[in-house]
Each structure stands twice: as structure tokens, then as C-alpha cells.
């Protein structure tokens, strides 16, 4: 849409003033408006317009220029500092002053300090050289392994692909996690959201998906750590080195990491998701790859935007969020898509404040997703992990024409029996199991077995649980649940279904339990 507006404006301006070039005419417009993604070789900085700092308000810095006011989204650099401080233009205030967002701490800045316009948005290194490396929001390496020297750089702001470039093929992405593959399967090239409150297992689930999908995938992956714990980022990096996904000795690494963790200023947290996305877009557009993009956590992207929004002087919207919440989210999510050249399959963890899915931040994200995996505190309290809510999680590709009629029928059968059990829980709580009919007793028994069979030991959580991690093929998952629904395992105790892989392990566990009791 913006691209179309930009092109219309350019045409109109040329018609009105033939002597003026489109670039000159749109000089005050956002950089993304008149530039499709351009990949260029890193160039030496040309002579740039300079300004001076006139105000510093937390992460927001006002800069005054005598001439050549930089357009919106341009990157400015503070001169005379040991570490590079990048400011991104957010508003034009009048009187040749721009309001900018700092990408790093503003400690030590003083009024009157010189600032240089780089003449372009924030540009980061892209290409195969980024694999195996960790970079920050402005593309600087933070893994203490020297500079990232790439042949090309790209701006972090760009338009979404045209409708005509998009691909509409639909195929299931098998994760090896029973509850996900059966009830809310993920689409290749789709957008997947993991919703959950604090401490219900979003990051563990995303780590398991990285372990199962990224390793088996064989293509490239990008992980963007947005405002989450530094410890988790560090653990992930070292796990990837140990498992061989990152190879420090040669160039066979399969993953690029982009971090802007909890301790970063809001400017960095609000932009680091775009940096990670830009790295993924290069592999999709230039190398025709099928890329996996993991983002942990999208809520922190919104939260950082909210922190900055108040400092920029915008009037807050519902629940104190920025008034541009839907625009910010849409601008980023529309770029995560599958084109005819390649695909980006994104898995995004989304924190749910106070377990309220109607909060504007998670509610705005729902509209953009192909599959939603909702993690429930009530299920986590039962000790069932992953704590996926089988009745709340949805998928656009849960369609018999895509997944097949057997898969569809088994999934709907599982959901029906769990819903029936949920309806009976009030009666059980008041009157007890003895007051139920024989049919209802059977429903409850099977539902409790299914509930436990939806649990699964994770490879990334082996050290915590003591259970060996399991990866279950889709056909085994369907076979197992179909057999439980059909009553083939009614005789087995429900604890035999807890924390196992395929259905064969249930039988083995039941035999083991019987031996222990005897």
C-alpha cells in the first residue's frame, strides 16, 4: 500500500514539476517509501550533513540541523564517541529539528555535541558471512569473534513483497511434537505464534522447535532475541555450538543470531526484530532459500515501542500502548511471508500479560498468524508439558483437503472428547465420578488418557526432567490417538500415558508399572 502511494506521489510530482527528480521531491518522506530493498556493497561514508544535540530525554534525542534535514527513518551517528551510537529519525519537529530514538544508552551525551547524518536508514551486513555469528540491532558483532565482513549490506526498513510475488502453496511442517502436529499443525512458510503468560514454557517450546525443525531442516535459520533474558540467549548459543548447528572452525554454520536483550534501551528492542527479519529476507530473496525465523519475544517489540512512544510525545492508546500499535505490528508481519523465490517460516513467542489474551498486544498479533499455539497455566499446573491448550490452539491448515481426512477426523475426535470432559468437570466436582453414566465415565477415562498422552518429554529439557527427549513422526501420532479414541487401550492405567513418545512406549510403560506393583 505504502509502495503504491509512493509511486503515485512520485508520478504526480514529476508531472507537476518536470525538473524535479522523485528522490528530491520526496526528500522529507520515510526512506522505506521510495526504496524497494536495495542490497549494496559496504561503501565509505560520504560527506554528510551535520547537526548538534539540543535535548536528551531518556532514549529520545533531539538534533538540530542548519541545512539538509535528514528524512524520517534515516540513521544519524554521534561524533567523537569511543563506541558507535546510532540515532534513528522518528519525527520532524520544525525549526530544522528532528526527534530521534537512540539504539544504545544515551549516558554521557551533552547538548551541543556533533551528530552526522549517514544519508540512509540503519544498514546491516547480510549474506552467508552472518551465519554462525551474533550481531546487535545495528549489525555489529557481539560474539567477540572479530568483524562481520560481508559483500553486501541492507537497510532494516523495507516494503513487504508485492501480492503478485507471493506463493500460496500449503504444506504441513512436521515438528515431532504430538500436540502441535495433531491439533494445530504448522504450515511451511507460515507464521506461527506461541502464546502464554510468564513461566508456562514458551521459550522451552521454541528451543525444542529449533532443535527438531532447524536441525532436520538443513536450510538456514535466523534467531532474533527481542528483549528476553541474556542468559537464555547465551545458553542457546552454546547449545548450538555443542550440537554443531554453529561451527566455529569453518563456514558450515546454519544459523544467524541477532540479539537485543532485556538490558538494551527501548530503541534497540523496538528495532532488533527488523534486523533479524532483514537477515532472513536476504536468504529468501537473494539465495532462494526456505528460511526459518525464530523470534522470542514479539511482545517485547510492542513493549519497547510503547516505552519510546510516550517519550516521542504521542498520546497513549488502550491500556497505555502506543497509538501506532497495529501499524507497527503490520509493517513487520507483512514482510514475513513466502514468495515465489523462497519462504520464511516464522515461529514467534508472544508473552500474554496477566494471562489475558484480549490484551491489545497479543490481540493485535492474532490477526497476522496462520497457526496459534496457546499455552495454558491450568494445564501447566497439572504437570502436563508442553502446556498447550488443545481447545484454544488453532491452525489455518486444519482442513481435510490439506492434512487428509484421517488426520482431521482424529484431531476433531480428540477435541470433542476433551470438550465433553471439560463440560463434565463441574458435575464431577460437585457429585463425584460415581454419579456419572457408564458412557460418561468412559469419556472421562479416555479424555484423561488423551490429556496425558498429549504430554511429551523434550530433548532440550532432559537435564530438568530426567526423561529422554522424544520426537514423534506424524503418522505415529495419528495412529496413537486413533487407537485411544477407539478404546484399544482402555485397560491400561492413565499414568502409563504420561511423558512418553509414540503409543508403543505406553504399552511398555504399563508393563513396567504392572511389574512394580506386583
From Swiss-Prot:
Q: Which reaction does it catalyse?
A: ATP + H2O + 4 H(+)(in) = ADP + phosphate + 5 H(+)(out)
- Report the membrane topology from the UniProt record: Peripheral membrane protein
Any one Pfam family match given in the protein's UniProt record, by short name: ATP-synt_VA_C
Where is ADP annotated to bind? 199-204
SMART domains xrefs: AAA
List GO terms (cellular component aspect).
Answer: mitochondrial inner membrane; mitochondrion; proton-transporting ATP synthase complex
> Has the keyword Transit peptide been applied to this entry?
yes
Q: What does this protein do?
A: Catalytic subunit beta, of the mitochondrial membrane ATP synthase complex (F(1)F(0) ATP synthase or Complex V) that produces ATP from ADP in the presence of a proton gradient across the membrane which is generated by electron transport complexes of the respiratory chain. ATP synthase complex consist of a soluble F(1) head domain - the catalytic core - and a membrane F(1) domain - the membrane proton channel. These two domains are linked by a central stalk rotating inside the F(1) region and a stationary peripheral stalk.
Q: How does it assemble?
A: Homotrimer. Component of the ATP synthase complex composed at least of ATP5F1A/subunit alpha, ATP5F1B/subunit beta, ATP5MC1/subunit c (homooctomer), MT-ATP6/subunit a, MT-ATP8/subunit 8, ATP5ME/subunit e, ATP5MF/subunit f, ATP5MG/subunit g, ATP5MK/subunit k, ATP5MJ/subunit j, ATP5F1C/subunit gamma, ATP5F1D/subunit delta, ATP5F1E/subunit epsilon, ATP5PF/subunit F6, ATP5PB/subunit b, ATP5PD/subunit d, ATP5PO/subunit OSCP.
> Which protein family is it in?
Belongs to the ATPase alpha/beta chains family.
Annotated protein name in UniProt: ATP synthase F(1) complex catalytic subunit beta, mitochondrial
Amino acid at each position: 500500500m505504502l509502495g503504491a502511494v509512493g509511486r503515485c506521489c512520485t508520478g504526480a510530482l514529476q508531472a507537476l514539476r518536470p525538473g524535479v527528480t522523485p528522490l528530491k521531491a520526496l526528500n522529507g518522506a520515510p526512506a522505506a517509501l521510495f526504496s524497494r530493498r536495495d542490497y549494496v556493497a559496504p561503501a565509505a561514508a560520504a560527506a554528510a550533513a551535520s547537526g548538534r544535540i539540543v535535548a536528551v530525554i531518556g532514549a529520545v534525542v533531539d538534533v538540530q540541523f542548519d541545512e539538509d534535514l535528514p528524512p524520517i527513518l534515516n540513521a544519524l551517528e554521534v561524533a567523537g564517541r569511543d563506541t558507535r551510537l546510532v540515532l534513528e529519525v522518528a519525527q520532524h519537529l520544525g525549526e530544522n529539528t528532528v526527534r530521534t530514538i537512540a539504539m544504545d544508552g544515551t549516558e554521557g551525551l551533552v547538548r551541543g555535541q556533533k551528530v552526522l547524518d549517514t544519508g540512509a536508514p540503519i544498514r546491516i551486513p547480510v549474506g552467508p558471512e552472518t551465519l554462525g555469528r551474533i550481531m546487535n540491532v545495528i549489525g555489529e558483532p557481539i560474539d567477540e569473534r572479530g568483524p562481520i565482513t560481508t559483500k553486501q549490506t541492507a537497510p532494516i526498513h523495507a516494503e513487504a513483497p508485492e501480492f503478485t510475488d507471493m506463493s500460496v502453496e500449503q504444506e504441513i511442517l512436521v515438528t515431532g511434537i504430538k500436540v502441535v502436529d495433531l491439533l494445530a499443525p504448522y504450515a511451511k512458510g507460515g507464521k506461527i505464534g506461541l502464546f502464554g503468560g510468564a513461566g508456562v514454557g514458551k521459550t522451552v517450546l521454541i528451543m525444542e522447535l529449533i532443535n527438531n525443525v532447524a536441525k532436520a531442516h538443513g536450510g538456514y535459520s535466523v534467531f532474533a532475541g527481542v528483549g528476553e533474558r541474556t542468559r537464555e540467549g547465551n545458553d542457546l548459543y552454546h547449545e548450538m555450538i555443542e550440537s554443531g548447528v554453529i561451527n566455529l572452525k569453518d563456514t558450515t554454520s546454519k544459523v544467524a543470531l541477532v540479539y537485543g536483550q532485556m538490558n538494551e534501551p527501548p530503541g534497540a528492542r523496538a528495532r532488533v526484530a527488523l534486523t533479524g527479519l532483514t537477515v532472513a529476507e536476504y536468504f529468501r530473496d537473494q539465495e532462494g532459500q526456505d528460511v526459518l525465523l525464530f523470534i522470542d519475544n514479539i511482545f517485547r517489540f510492542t513493549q519497547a515501542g510503547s516505552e519510546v512512544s510516550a517519550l516521542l510525545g504521542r498520546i497513549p492508546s488502550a491500556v497505555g500502548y502506543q497509538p501506532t500499535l497495529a501499524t507497527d505490528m503490520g509493517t513487520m508481519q507483512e514482510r514475513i511471508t513466502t514468495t515465489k523465490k523462497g519462504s520464511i517460516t516464522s515461529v514467534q513467542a508472544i508473552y500474554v500479560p496477566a494471562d489475558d489474551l484480549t490484551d491489545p498486544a497479543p490481540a493485535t498479533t492474532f490477526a497476522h498468524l496462520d497457526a496459534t499455539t496457546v499455552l495454558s497455566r491450568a494445564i501447566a499446573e497439572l504437570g502436563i508439558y508442553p502446556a498447550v491448550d488443545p481447545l484454544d490452539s488453532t491452525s489455518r491448515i486444519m482442513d481435510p483437503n490439506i492434512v487428509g481426512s484421517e488426520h482431521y477426523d482424529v484431531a476433531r475426535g480428540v477435541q470433542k472428547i476433551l470438550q465433553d470432559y471439560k463440560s463434565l468437570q463441574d458435575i464431577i466436582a460437585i457429585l463425584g465420578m460415581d454419579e456419572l453414566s457408564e458412557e460418561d465415565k468412559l469419556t472421562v477415562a479416555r479424555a484423561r488418557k488423551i490429556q496425558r498422552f498429549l504430554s511429551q518429554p523434550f530433548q532440550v529439557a532432559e537435564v530438568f526432567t530426567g526423561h529422554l527427549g522424544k520426537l514423534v513422526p506424524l503418522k505415529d501420532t495419528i495412529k496413537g490417538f486413533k487407537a485411544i479414541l477407539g478404546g484399544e487401550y482402555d485397560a491400561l492405567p492413565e499414568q502409563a500415558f504420561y511423558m512418553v513418545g509414540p503409543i508403543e512406549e505406553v504399552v511398555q510403560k504399563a508393563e513396567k508399572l504392572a511389574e512394580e506393583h506386583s
